[in-house]
Amino acid sequence: MEVKQDKAYQQAAGCLPPLRAAQLAALEGQEEVEELRFRAGRPPAVKTARGERGLELAVVTAQELREILSRAARYSVHSYTESLKNGFVTLTGGHRLGVCGTAAEENGKVVGIRGLSSVNLRIARQAWGVDAVIAPWVGEGEPQSMLLLSPPGFGKTTLLREWVRAVSDKGHT
């Protein structure tokens, strides 16, 4: 049976090692996947709106986690130090690779991450029309300022991207 390939999913999976990317390319329901989760010593898992489910694949190794981060950072992890201090690397297409490990500190300041224990690949997707949620507050004129608050995974970035697209489509820059 042929698996329907989802463009956003495939683009995000581009930072994975080739063998793991090939395994996950065969996953059905790619268009529903919100996150790919990789934890050392456990098989990968996928998160959809219906919840998380483990995949029947080989367990993730610490070396594989390091390779995923290295590939996501285009083999230049040091150039992503500022981003890694915040716990993630932004990928082409707006996808984000969250990292979990031990903070490396110098003089009381976080300077990087070591001992990766897991990575989480969040897949960015376009969501047409969600800007209508905030339209009553921003109106047609110049927007003032706004603060978007919600737990992780509730669509703050999606809402903001769609709002910027909608404002841009109306000719505002």
Outline where the language-model segments fall.
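The conserved Walker
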Residues: P152
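N-terminal accessory targeting/assembly segments
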Residues: M1-G93
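Post-Walker A helix-loop "phosphate-sensing" segment adjacent to the P-loop in P-loop NTPases
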Residues: R165-T173
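N-terminal regions of ATP-driven nucleic-acid and macromolecular assemblies
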Residues: M1, G29, W128-A132, H172
